Amino acid sequence: MSHPAQLQFVKSVKEKFPDYFIRKNVLEVGSLNINGSIRDFFEQCVYVGVDIGPGRDVDLVARGENLAYHDESFDVVASCECFEHNPEWVATFNNMVRMSSGLVFFSCATLGRAEHGTPRTSPYDAPYCGEYYKNLTEGDVRSACDLSSFKEYAFSIDNQAHDLYFWGIK
């Protein structure tokens, strides 16, 4: 699911690392196009979109934590607006890092964002998600994930959209 602030984040990552957005192998975890996609930011790329259910822009139905591609199979691995819905977000992130040879980035809901995409709230916003929902913080990621494989990385927060953003270069 896309929203304007998250798309602006992806645009900023593309502006910072333009070489990773043309003629690369790209894996997107959580690619179901509900109201927009990051796929359009990539030019002349081999692009694999993965999500837990079928739909527009989903090339493979699978869970991010279970993907078994070889280490460093992709130049870019991304996930936008999914981790807050995934009880296995740590395993998914670690798997994304393992499969990337270069750029990893994600966006997800952080403190202040209302619960969404659950049967309790708006099930059509995330049709394959279950009951789990957790807004994540930079501290959650730092305490649960090993960031040592990145040469450079950064976190940022959009306080209006209540989004947490991360990019890292291996």
Located regions from the model:
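Class I SAM-dependent methyltransferase Rossmann-like catalytic core
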Residues: 1-20
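S-adenosyl-L-methionine-dependent methyltransferase catalytic module, highlighting the catalytic core
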Residues: 87-99, 103-170
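Conserved phosphate-coordination/catalytic loops
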Residues: 4-8, 83-87, 135
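N-terminal/domain-start segments enriched in small and hydrophobic, helix-friendly residues
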Residues: 17-26, 126-130
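Short N-terminal micro-motifs specific to bacterial/archaeal maturation
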Residues: 1, 17, 58, 80-83, ...
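Conserved SAM-binding loop
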Residues: 24-114, 166-169
